[in-house]
């Protein structure tokens, strides 16, 4: 199986499980590859790290939730695996150049 196909399959699996605790250890165990080899293969195929991919997917899901629901920001953060609303807000702001609250209200 090609590296491209392996990573495509892993991305599909990650996307299905994005609301669960995911990190390199979990994904490496699922893939059957070492952490080092998986990171190298993932970066070669996608041009980003596995951690960056997971973080971006979670933030995109959060952005959709903020746009389409009135759910509390705290609940969105917790559902996406962040340990606190403050951590979530800091990471969200780094990605979108505004806080989750500003993002929700400026649409």
UniProtKB/Swiss-Prot annotation:
PROSITE patterns: HTH_ARAC_FAMILY_1, HTH_ARAC_FAMILY_2
Cited Pfam families: HTH_18 (PF12833)
UniProt GO cellular component terms: cytosol
UniProt cross-references to InterPro entries, sorted A to Z: Homeodomain-like_sf (IPR009057), HTH_AraC (IPR018060), HTH_AraC-typ_CS (IPR018062), MarA-like (IPR050959), Tscrpt_reg_AraC-type_HTH (IPR020449)
DNA-binding region per Swiss-Prot/TrEMBL record: 25-46, 73-96
Keywords: Activator, Cytoplasm, DNA-binding, Transcription, Transcription regulation
Major subcellular site: cytoplasm
Boundaries of every HTH araC/xylS-type domain copy: 8-106
GO molecular function: bacterial-type RNA polymerase holo enzyme binding; cis-regulatory region sequence-specific DNA binding; DNA-binding transcription factor activity; sequence-specific DNA binding
Compartment(s) of residence: Cytoplasm
Biological process annotations from GO: regulation of DNA-templated transcription
Keyword Cell membrane: no
Protein purpose: Transcriptional activator of the superoxide response regulon of E.coli that includes at least 10 genes such as sodA, nfo, zwf and micF. Binds the DNA sequence 5'-GCACN(7)CAA-3'. It also facilitates the subsequent binding of RNA polymerase to the micF and the nfo promoters.
UniProt-listed NCBIfam families: PRK10219.1
UniProt-listed PANTHER family: REGULATORY PROTEIN SOXS, RIGHT ORIGIN-BINDING PROTEIN
The protein's name in its UniProt record: Regulatory protein SoxS
């Amino acid at each position: 199986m090609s590296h491209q196909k392996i990573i495509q399959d892993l991305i599909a699996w990650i996307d299905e499980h994005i609301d669960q605790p995911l990190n390199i250890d979990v994904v490496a165990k699922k893939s059957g590859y070492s952490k080092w080899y998986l990171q190298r293969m993932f970066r070669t195929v996608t041009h980003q790290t596995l951690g960056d991919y997971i973080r971006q997917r979670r933030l995109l899901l959060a952005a959709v939730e903020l746009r389409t629901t009135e759910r509390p920001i705290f609940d969105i953060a917790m559902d996406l695996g962040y340990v606190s609303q403050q951590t979530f807000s800091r990471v969200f702001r780094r990605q979108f150049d505004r806080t989750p609250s500003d993002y929700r209200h400026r649409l």
